[in-house]
UniProtKB/Swiss-Prot annotation:
EC main group: transferase
UniProt subcellular location: Cytoplasm
Activity control note: Feedback inhibited by histidine.
Name assigned to this protein: ATP phosphoribosyltransferase
Gene: hisG
Entries under Pfam families matching the protein: HisG, HisG_C
Length: 281
């Protein structure tokens, strides 16, 4: 049975559980459940601290896990990225009091608080900056006011929390992060991984694309199919009246209205859009 680690709290947890549910896997109904066995799909899910997941997977205790790239790299675990999951996007940034710092070089001899000690120390070494790293488990934005640090390094999504604490981001992002499916890099592919990966890829496609249908005259078809080429070409079916066809094609969800406008301009009519519930590409 495939053994998979899932974050047990926070935004990573909610989005991971939603994605696994959309992929057809049973998920826990209560935060008190630590383990859930999905016998129908041959998967055992373990709900763990996001920061610990890479360690369990890298150590071979569990086959797979869902965690952030930031947590994976900071852990130093022997686990590798298997699939990007397109949620929990963030950046690892430096921040400090307004107007005090402009680059990482300004941190020479300073104290920097972070929950990501490995990532920060690696970055400082690469930049040739000698600074004291103060490791905290959370709420690092309060460390400057409390006199523990001069600056911080933290994962940022919107930056609202930092601004509320009177801090500003400076210098370039240290790294970008998002949610990942990970596995131990030097192990053979575990049984069941290919199905899980294919299902998650199907969820990503279903979230990113819609199905677009429209009617058009045959002589106008080349211009229309140039707008909607689909993945491997559109599906074209004759209609009941001479010279008209129905076209079906996958379109990126973000481009829906722009594509509909372009189709209308070249003569397409009865343009309809339907969501994709699941996909295998």
């Amino acid at each position: 049975m495939l053994r998979v680690a899932v974050p047990n709290k926070g935004a990573l947890s909610e989005s991971a559980i939603t994605m696994l549910t959309e992929a057809g896997y049973r998920q826990r109904r209560s935060s008190r459940e630590l383990v859930l066995v999905d016998n129908d799909n041959g998967v055992e899910f373990f709900y763990l601290r996001p920061r610990d997941i890479a360690i369990y997977v890298g150590g071979g205790t569990l086959d797979l896990g869902i965690t952030g790239r930031d947590l994976l790299l900071d852990s130093g675990a022997e686990a590798a990225e298997e699939l990007c999951l397109d949620f929990a996007r963030s950046t690892f940034r430096l921040a400090g009091p307004l107007g005090q710092f402009s680059s990482v070089q300004d941190l020479q001899g300073k104290r920097i608080a972070t929950s990501y000690q490995v990532l920060l120390e690696r970055h400082l070494a690469e930049q040739g900056v000698d600074a004291e790293v103060v490791r905290l488990d959370g709420a690092v934005e309060s460390s400057i006011r409390l006199g523990v640090a001069d600056a911080i390094a933290d994962v940022v999504e919107t930056g609202n929390t930092l601004r509320a604490a009177g801090l500003e981001i400076f210098d370039e992002p240290i790294m970008t992060s998002e949610a990942l499916l990970i596995r131990r890099g030097d192990e053979p592919e575990p049984e069941g991984l290919s199905v899980l990966r294919r299902r998650l890829q199907g969820v990503l496609v279903a979230r990113q694309y819609v199905m677009m249908d429209y009617d058009i005259r045959e002589e106008l078809l080349p211009a229309a199919t140039e707008i909607t080429p689909g993945m491997e070409g559109p599906t074209i079916s004759p209609l009941g009246r001479d010279g008209a066809v129905a076209v079906r094609s996958m379109v990126r969800k973000a481009d829906t209205n722009k594509v509909m406008d372009a189709l209308y301009e070249v003569g397409a009519r009865a343009i309809l859009v339907s969501p994709i519930q699941a996909a295998r590409i």
